[in-house]
Each structure stands twice: as structure tokens, then as C-alpha cells.
Amino acid sequence: MHLLIPAAGSGKRMGSGHNKLLLNVLGQPLLSWTVQAALASQSIEWIGIMGQPYDFPAFEALLTPLHSPKPVQLIVGGDTRQQSVFNGIQALPPGAKFVLIHDGARCLATPDLFDRCTEALQHCQGLIAAMPVKDTIKIVNADGWITDTPDRQGLWGAQTPQGFDVALLKACHDKGKQEGWEVTDDAALLEKCGQPVKIVPGEDTNLKITTPVDLAIAEFILGQRSAKSA
């Protein structure tokens, strides 16, 4: 399985002023934890990391001590996640049939989640890891008034990895560029193209590290895991 990791974010909501994936988490850059989980996966054979060239020296520095037995390629990302993934697709090795896409900021994903998504992708053309929402969701208008309360039973919170047939994903990205679609994940492109996307149960701990509170939670969970494996 081939894996693409968008890692070109600026970390504005983290208040760091630079790429949040380079923030220190228990002595290692956040991105390092994400890559280590992918390397520990039995199914991942190749990894592409999309980022900005000025971050490449830092990426190379965090990759060196990992001594990856699998190829890891740095790919120039775009101004948006959608553009970065498009660039990553173009850089896939010839013959790549399927691809997983995983947010660099989801450093708590386990190797098992990558492997379960890989297995599920053998039986569909598109999937996402997701979890049923636990909170009641309110739809609110621009003035702050609740307009609806959707049935929670049918609501799932999207995570990554998301997995796709490469040829289909390329076609949907091309269609998106032609139509000017702007989406926040690749599953939405398939949806707009009328293609079905399957849900694979994600993980409660698979948080996207976006705020300082998220970072503190990640440090706690990774610390607990490290203690158990010691």
C-alpha cells in the first residue's frame, strides 16, 4: 500500500507561527510519531510526505533517526490540502493501484488502523476512517440561532486514513479542478462525482492535533503507550 501524508500546514490555530507538525511531542516532532505508526504498519510499503520546501530540511532531520526500511519521498505541497494531495498523486510510483491519505497531524493513529483500511480497500474504491459522533449536533445560522438538530444516529466524524483507487481518485481530482470544487477531504471529491465511499471504524484516540489542548492530550496518550511498551 502507498501512503500520502499532507504536511504543509501553517499551524495558525496552534499559535505556533510555523508548521505545527514540527512541534515537540515527548522529545520528537509531531510528524515523527505519525511516520513511525505508518512504518510499523504491515501493509504500508511506500510513504510520500507533501510539504513546503522550506520545511524539507526539518523533515529530513526527523526522518534520519527513524532509519526507515521503506522508501519515504518528500513532495512539494500546494497552498491547500486539496492541492497538496493532487501533487502527491502525481508523485506516486508507477503502477500504484491504491493509496491511503493520512493527515500528518493525526499522530495517534495506530498501525492497526492503517492495516484495517488497507484490507477494506481491497473490497471498495473509496473509504474513510470515521467514528459515530457522541455529541448532539446543532445546525446554526449566521446570527447564532439553532435551525435544526439532525438525528445523531446517522452522523459520523470523519478521520483519516482515507483510501482510494488511484485511477478513480485522479479522475475525481481532475474533475474537481475543472469545476472549481474546493473540498476539505478527498472523500468529498468522490461524493461530488457520484462515487460511493465506505466507512471503516476509526479510533477514539485518532485526534487531529489542532490546538494546544489537543497537543496536551496527544502527549498524555503517547506517554501512556510508551510506558506500556517499555
Curated annotation (Swiss-Prot):
PANTHER family: D-RIBITOL-5-PHOSPHATE CYTIDYLYLTRANSFERASE (PTHR43015:SF1). The record marks 152, 208 as: Positions MEP for the nucleophilic attack. The gene is ispD. Pathway: Isoprenoid biosynthesis; isopentenyl diphosphate biosynthesis via DXP pathway; isopentenyl diphosphate from 1-deoxy-D-xylulose 5-phosphate: step 2/6. This is 2-C-methyl-D-erythritol 4-phosphate cytidylyltransferase. Pfam families: IspD. One of its GO terms (biological process) is isopentenyl diphosphate biosynthetic process, methylerythritol 4-phosphate pathway. SUPFAM superfamilies: Nucleotide-diphospho-sugar transferases (SSF53448). Its EC number is 2.7.7.60. The record marks 13, 20 as: Transition state stabilizer. Gene3D superfamilies: Spore Coat Polysaccharide Biosynthesis Protein SpsA, Chain A. GO terms for molecular function: 2-C-methyl-D-erythritol 4-phosphate cytidylyltransferase activity; cytidylyltransferase activity. One of its GO terms (cellular component) is cytosol. HAMAP family: IspD. It comes from Synechocystis sp. (strain ATCC 27184 / PCC 6803 / Kazusa).
